[in-house]
A protein has these predicted regions:
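Generic beta-sheet signal
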Residues: 85-96
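Phosphate-coordination/substrate-recognition cap region in phosphate-metabolizing enzymes
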Residues: 1-52, 56
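Short beta-strand scaffold positions
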Residues: 8-9, 73, 92-93
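Generic structural signal for well-ordered alpha-helical scaffold segments
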Residues: 76-83, 102
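Short glycine/proline- and acidic residue-enriched helix-loop micro-motifs
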Residues: 50-70
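Acidic, low-complexity terminal tails and accessory targeting/binding regions
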Residues: 35-46, 103-142
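Glycine-rich phosphate-binding loop signature in dinucleotide/nucleotide-binding domains
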Residues: 1-2, 82-87
Length: 142
């Protein structure tokens, strides 16, 4: 499959995934970096829930990190970047951020991102067709 642009988060795990998928020279863009978890960086959701049982990333954000509105705005920034490409775009990023991209693509409230499950190293496809912006494939194994 050919792509007109391949973008990646500047984090090594995304770059390495791009390389393993056969794309050794993606365009690095900080807009695709993982969500800034602030004080929760490095903590599991389970650990966060021990002190904040009702915490939800896309509703509450993270203390000292990105707010849900900031996550959504950055997702929209990536959509703008990708939409400027005439043709097919491939992106290597991170789970929580890619959920936000899918939700922003469909113009839904960021809180809806919590309903999306996304495994590591899976394929998802958004596109514009006669119905408008659609989530054509989600969390599919390679």
């Amino acid at each position: 499959m050919n792509f007109d642009a391949v973008f990646s988060s500047p984090l090594q795990r995304a770059i390495r995934t791009a390389e393993l998928a056969g794309f050794p020279d993606p365009q690095l863009t900080p807009v695709l970096r993982e969500v800034d978890y602030g004080e929760y960086e490095g903590m599991t959701t389970k650990a966060i829930h021990e002190s904040r049982p009702d915490w939800e990333l896309y509703r509450d954000g993270s203390p000292g990190g990105e707010t849900p509105a900031q996550i959504y705005a950055r997702a929209t920034d990536f959509i703008t970047l990708a939409s400027a490409v005439k043709g097919r775009v491939l992106a290597f990023s991170h789970g929580h951020f890619l959920r936000a991209v899918a939700i922003a693509w469909m113009r839904l409230d960021i809180k809806a991102a919590s309903a999306l499950h996304l495994d590591v190293a899976t394929l998802s496809l958004v596109r514009d067709d006669e119905r408008g912006r659609v989530l054509a494939m989600w969390n599919s194994p390679p």
